[in-house]
């Protein structure tokens, strides 16, 4: 994350995972509309519903 800040360990306690085409990726729910995941989890035209 470029320009990001460190957060408290309890600030974002909710996790999710994504399974697509045989791959698992972890996600962190950072607010009601956004999840944060690693760059290698990017899949074009993917839609995520929570």
Swiss-Prot record:
UniProt key word Membrane: no
EC numbers: 3.4.21.-
Subcellular location: Secreted
Pfam families tied to this protein: Trypsin (PF00089)
Tissue expression pattern: Expressed by the venom gland.
UniProt GO molecular function: serine-type endopeptidase activity; toxin activity
Gene Ontology biological process terms in this record: proteolysis
pH-linked activity: Optimum pH is 6.0-10.5.
Catalytic residue list: 40 (charge relay system)
Remarks, miscellaneous: Acidic enzyme (pI is 3.7). Negative results: does not degrade the gamma chain of fibrinogen (FGG).
Record's function text: Snake venom serine protease that interferes with the hemostatic system of the prey. It almost completely degrades both Aalpha (FGA) and Bbeta (FGB) chains of fibrinogen. It presents a higher ability to degrade fibrin clots than BpirSP27. It shows a decrease in the clotting time of human plasma in the presence of increasing doses of the enzyme. Its minimum coagulant dose (MCD) is 20 ug.
Similarity comment: Belongs to the peptidase S1 family. Snake venom subfamily.
Protein name: Thrombin-like enzyme BpirSP41
Organismal lineage: Eukaryota, Metazoa, Chordata, Craniata, Vertebrata
């Amino acid at each position: 994350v470029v320009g990001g800040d460190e957060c408290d360990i309890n600030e974002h306690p909710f996790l999710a995972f994504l399974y697509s085409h045989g791959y698992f990726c972890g996600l962190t729910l950072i607010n009601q509309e956004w999840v944060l995941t690693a760059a290698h989890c990017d899949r074009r035209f993917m839609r995520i519903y929570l």
